[in-house]
Amino acid sequence: MTRAGFTALDDELKTLKTVERPAVIRSIAEAREHGDLSENAEYHAAREKQSFIEGRIKELEAILSLAEVIDPAKLSGSIKFGATVTILDEETEEERTYQIVGEAEADIEAGLLNIKSPLARALIGKDEGDSIEVKTPGGERGYEVVSVRFV
């Protein structure tokens, strides 16, 4: 996991524990004051939200406890985890830049490519100038590696 990914997940965990959890506990207490819990929609909604928050806290704690933080700036060579890669779509001539990251921090819209994705798996081990073929739901796509950076 990159340092930025670790920090983002750690920040989310802190927010859940210090802001979200206390807020939902207050919501449950307020809903209880309204009387009969069997037909109290506010109470049931707050309990459901509490369950989600507690589940996410456990999930984040597990991810962070097992995370190995890697500094991409200390890496070099061919494409590997942490690399920032610019590729050229050979069909559309469109360039895209992605950083190859772990599952927990992946966000394709932000240019953070899951290392387990077909595109990332095809890129691993390649160098600038190499071409790759990736099977997509729309058929095979060809890409050329334009640049590889470790930042």
From Swiss-Prot:
Cysteines paired by S-S bonds: none
Superkingdom classification of source: Bacteria
GO biological process: DNA-templated transcription elongation; regulation of DNA-templated transcription elongation
Keywords tagged on the record: Coiled coil, DNA-binding, Transcription, Transcription regulation
Coiled coil: 41-62
Pfam families for this protein: GreA_GreB, GreA_GreB_N
Molecular function terms, GO-annotated: DNA binding; RNA polymerase binding
Classification via InterPro entries: GreA/GreB_C_sf, TF_GreA/GreB_CS, Tscrpt_elong_fac_GreA, Tscrpt_elong_fac_GreA/B, Tscrpt_elong_fac_GreA/B_C, Tscrpt_elong_fac_GreA/B_fam, Tscrpt_elong_fac_GreA/B_N, Tscrpt_elong_fac_GreA/B_N_sf
SUPFAM superfamilies: FKBP-like (SSF54534), GreA transcript cleavage protein, N-terminal domain (SSF46557)
Role description: Necessary for efficient RNA polymerase transcription elongation past template-encoded arresting sites. The arresting sites in DNA have the property of trapping a certain fraction of elongating RNA polymerases that pass through, resulting in locked ternary complexes. Cleavage of the nascent transcript by cleavage factors such as GreA or GreB allows the resumption of elongation from the new 3'terminus. GreA releases sequences of 2 to 3 nucleotides.
NCBIfam families: greA, PRK00226.1-2, PRK00226.1-4, PRK00226.1-5
Entry similarity comment: Belongs to the GreA/GreB family.
Protein name as catalogued: Transcription elongation factor GreA
Organism the protein comes from: Cereibacter sphaeroides (strain ATCC 17023 / DSM 158 / JCM 6121 / CCUG 31486 / LMG 2827 / NBRC 12203 / NCIMB 8253 / ATH 2.4.1.) (Rhodobacter sphaeroides)
Name of encoding gene: greA
